[in-house]
From Swiss-Prot:
Xref: PANTHER family: SEX-DETERMINING REGION Y PROTEIN, SOX TRANSCRIPTION FACTOR
Gene this chain is encoded by: SRY
Name of the protein: Sex-determining region Y protein
Keywords of this entry: Activator, Calmodulin-binding, Cytoplasm, Differentiation, DNA-binding, Nucleus, Sexual differentiation, Transcription, Transcription regulation
Matches recorded under Pfam families: HMG_box
Job of this protein: Transcriptional regulator that controls a genetic switch in male development. It is necessary and sufficient for initiating male sex determination by directing the development of supporting cell precursors (pre-Sertoli cells) as Sertoli rather than granulosa cells. Involved in different aspects of gene regulation including promoter activation or repression. Binds to the DNA consensus sequence 5'-[AT]AACAA[AT]-3'. SRY HMG box recognizes DNA by partial intercalation in the minor groove and promotes DNA bending. Also involved in pre-mRNA splicing.
GO CC entries: cytoplasm; nuclear speck; nucleus
Keyword Transmembrane helix attributed: no
Annotated DNA-binding residue span(s): 54-122
UniProt family annotation: Belongs to the SRY family.
Organism listed in the record: Hydrurga leptonyx (Leopard seal)
Length: 221
């Protein structure tokens, strides 16, 4: 029932089965995968390629500029496409209604043919990507929280180093408020801080001694 394989045939079959994948061409590797074949036919990741995408029917200006653009490009090889479009747009505006009418008729004929060929066609314009703004201003909520944090931190500073703390905190608070808060709000906060410092100066010596003994010394950088 079973045929006897020669040693040479068996060796050739084993070598054919043990051929590594990197020894084969990329075309053979792609054609063995049905998913890859579908990707090749549709162009990329399974979506329709630009060639299979249905284009909009031409309007009257596009019908007129189709030949005019080619003529201007041949006459001015160094002219860019944007400059050619501007020139064609200006020339189209200078035409009279009688001169434009044949191109409107041709555009209507092309649109009728397009509707017959693609009855379910709907124009879907591509959305432009929004630019990401990297430089954003500090929100008002975060700036107010920063001011409250600065005031709370200064309350824990000893009396002997309060002047240095206020001098270090006031420029930072003013810089944050200048970009997000009005000037009058910054002035009111500074006045509140000065009032707090002046009231602490009128404390009794016993209260000051208690604060100095309870709080650890603060060494400004």
């Amino acid at each position: 029932m079973f045929g006897v394989l020669n040693s040479s045939d068996h060796r050739a079959a084993v070598q054919q089965r043990n051929i590594p994948a990197f020894g084969r061409t990329s075309f053979e590797l792609w054609t063995d995968n049905p998913t890859s074949n579908y990707r090749c036919e549709t162009g990329g990741n399974g979506r329709d390629s630009g060639q299979n995408r249905v284009r909009r029917p031409m309007n009257a200006f596009m019908v007129w500029s189709r030949d005019q653009r080619r003529r201007v490009a041949l006459e001015n090889p160094q002219m860019q496409n944007s400059e050619i479009s501007k020139q064609l747009g200006y020339q189209w505006k200078m035409l009279t209604e009688a001169e434009k009418w044949p191109f409107f008729e041709e555009a209507q004929r092309l649109q009728a043919m397009h509707r017959e060929k693609y009855p379910d066609y709907k124009y879907r314009p591509r959305r432009k990507a929004l630019p990401q703004n990297s430089d954003k201003l500090l929100p008002a909520a975060s700036s107010s929280m920063l001011c409250r944090q600065v005031l709370v931190d200064e309350k824990w500073c000893p009396f002997t180093y309060r002047d240095s703390c206020s001098r270090a905190a006031h420029p930072r608070m003013e810089d944050q408020l200048s970009s997000s808060q009005p000037v009058n709000i910054a002035n009111s906060l500074l006045q509140q801080e000065h009032h707090y410092c002046s009231t602490s100066l009128r404390d009794s010596p016993e209260t000051l001694a208690m604060h100095l003994s309870a709080d650890p010394p603060f060494y400004p950088k």
